Amino acid sequence: MTTAELTFRAATEADIPAVVELVESAYRGDASRAGWTTEADLLEGQRTDPEGVAAVVRHADGRLLLAEIAGETVACCQLEHRGDHVYFGMFAVRPKLQGGGFGKVVMAEAERTARAEWGAAEMRMTVIRQRADLIAWYERRGYRRTGRMTPFPYGDERFGIPQRADLEFELLVKTLD
């Protein structure tokens, strides 16, 4: 599989189970250790669930963007228009494809979509502050750290079961050309 084979489309309700499986495989449990984006050492439990994915699919001012190869979902990301910017989230690439340039291509398509669909001037995301490797990857793609932190939702198992007491999110931003 190569990045040249990727096609993109908006997710539908029928895609929800595949998206949940993809996101879980990229971030949680032993399957996630095949890639470099695992959060398995920071969080146990779920990363998302069908209800959470359905809310993204149904959001009137957003899109769950799927990247496919020959009809198989291999990556996804959430785009949510929020006034002057678009929020980027739920980013996942199949673990065995990570490191092969797929994430870079998906992110470029997400940024293109944010500009084309909503005229967004900025993309924003929140990343667990302790994920230095992931933050560095985003920085190489033009995102900058803001130093603005928000607390991790301890006690809400919809976001996972923390394995340490100091988790928090940092806001990253990028001006879209």
Segments predicted by a language model, with ranges:
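Conserved beta-strand in the GNAT
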Residues: L66, E72-E80, Y87-A92
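Hydrophobic pocket-lining residues that define ligand/cofactor binding sites across diverse proteins
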Residues: A114-R115
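C-terminal "cap" of GNAT-fold acetyltransferases
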Residues: V56, A121-A136, R140-D177
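A short helix-loop-beta-strand connector motif used in the catalytic cores of GNAT acetyltransferases and
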Residues: T48-L66, A165-E168
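Conserved acetyl-CoA pyrophosphate-binding loop and the N-cap/start of the following alpha-helix
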Residues: L97, G101-E109
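A short, internal acetyl-CoA/4′-phosphopantetheine-binding micro-motif in the GNAT/acyltransferase core
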Residues: F91-G99, V127-R129
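Conserved N-terminal entry element of GNAT/NAT acetyltransferase domains
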Residues: M1-P17, E21, E170-D177
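Conserved GNAT-fold acetyl-CoA-binding loop/helix
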Residues: E24-V53
